[in-house]
Amino acid sequence: MRHATLLSTLLGLGLMTQAPALLAKNLVFCSEGSPAGFDTAQYTSATDNDAAEPIYNRLVEFERGGTAVQPALATRWEVSEDGLRYTFHLREGVKFHGNKTFTPSRDFNADDVLFTFNRMLDENHPFRTAYPTEFPYFISMGLDKNIAKVEKTGPLTVVFTLNSVDAAFIQNLAMSFASILSAEYADHLLAQGRPSDINQKPIGTGPFVFQRYQKDSQIRYKGNKDYWAPEDVKLDNLVFSINIDPSVRIQKLRRNECQVTLHPRPADLPSVKADDKLQVLQKPGFNLGYIAYNTQHPPFDRLEVRQAMDMAVNKQAIIQAVYQEAGQTAVNAMPPTQWSYDTSIQDAKYDPEKAKQLLKQAGVKEGTELTLWAMPVQRPYNPNAKLMAEMLQADWSKLGFKVRIVSYEWGEYLKRMKNGEHDIALIGWTGDNGDPDNWLGTLYSCDAIGSNNYSFWCDPQYDTLVKKAKQVTDREQRTQLYQQAQQRLKQQVPITPVAHSTVNQPISAKVNDFRVSPFGRNDFSGVSVD
């Protein structure tokens, strides 16, 4: 019966056209949302990055399931004594993918690295002029200001020159936004007058070749037979089956209609763990679910109002109802597993009566209306944003606010929040590179406004600490600076940290060597299916 179910599923997904295809190794991943595109430099959402992950490589990459950086398209690199010059030696013989309209005429080389980064650095770059877009990660980390130039000193050698020391530079280059694109493909698209195809018909060097994408349905890839690390390609076909409903994803996993899924409902975990055909991979969450107060919208431009909102949040009730056994109360602006976390910081005591007094002192009138934005999708840091929003609505209604819950499709939600349309929003983050700057700089700095700083909070004292910490290479000194920054942020309350969730990843017992990423990535290189 299980064989018949798998057969019908493969037929439905178009993975079989004739009998011999039964021998093919296929894996279906029940994903949680539709990506906006595949040009990773444009996006910060894990949904977008997951969809692009099979297609691309970067100069350096994180080891599967870990945080260590290892060579990828660069086989080695050197750093100058002053920490300002990084010389990368590129891998020889790496092939780009092709598609129906493009066949590469050469292997990967330094020109591709220059195109990838100069497009983000140069506002007048020809491709950027033809296809204007934003680069939120690149800008929020200040790389647009700190990378002075990128040069090639040979066909397989590239030098990055920085304006100031960046202790996280190598880790940053392992992130999705730094995926290497084909300069030749970009030239082809410009000549054809179709530059936006770089986002919808992606070409990379990665272990899987993009085939096609149907929004709200599926993404199809095939194994890259020319991959430079052939041992990492153990699947003939990879399919993302898009299902926003977590209960549907689990049902499909039970029926073997998919072999890997994500973000299960806490209530489903006991039965999944009891099923001998399934397994649940578990890892402490390197994540944070939080409430962002738009400090440019009155009355949240006033500290005492933000303090009042913060102390009126019943975190324990939220943890029990929303996260159940898979969540821990968050106190700080990053998870406790992140080095430099300040254990001395404590939450304000839950005190609705004191919150009312603060609001009265601030002159906030009873009946003041506000919008509370709730994510439409389940995220690793928030399994049920709708329920959390309803609980916050009840908490803040007791203070006299009229709270209206707002939601949009996930891509639209992020876009509108970056424009600052919200009063208060539910959002979160899963760490990308293991460095504190990926939290304290990427999410809360002045440079991150318009990208990942959804509080629109810009504090010069805080910013000075974070920037200084990034320019110091001694970890003890960096820790001291980052702890001062955490204390300043806690005092100013641009956010209310709510919870860190344990990552639970249900997969079929037939799946081999799938590794849960601390950064929330779903990486299918090296994965096989019995």
Give residue ranges: language-model regions.
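Detector for C-terminal structural segments
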Residues: K25-V28, A167, Q214, Q218, ...
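N-terminal lobe/hinge region of extracytoplasmic solute-binding protein
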Residues: C30-D82, N118, H125, I203-T205
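A structural "hinge/loop" feature
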Residues: S34-D50, L73, K100-P104, A167-S179, ...
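Aromatic- and charge-enriched surface segment that lines or borders ligand/interaction sites
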Residues: T75-P126, V159, K252, P299
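Surface-exposed binding/hinge segments that line
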Residues: H89, L121-D122, P126-A186
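Ligand-site clamp/hinge motif
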Residues: G193-N199, N224-S271, Q282, A389
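Structural transition elements
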Residues: F208, N294, F300, T329-A362, ...
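A bilobed periplasmic-binding-protein/Venus flytrap-type ligand-binding module shared by bacterial periplasmic
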Residues: K222-D226, G285-A308, A312
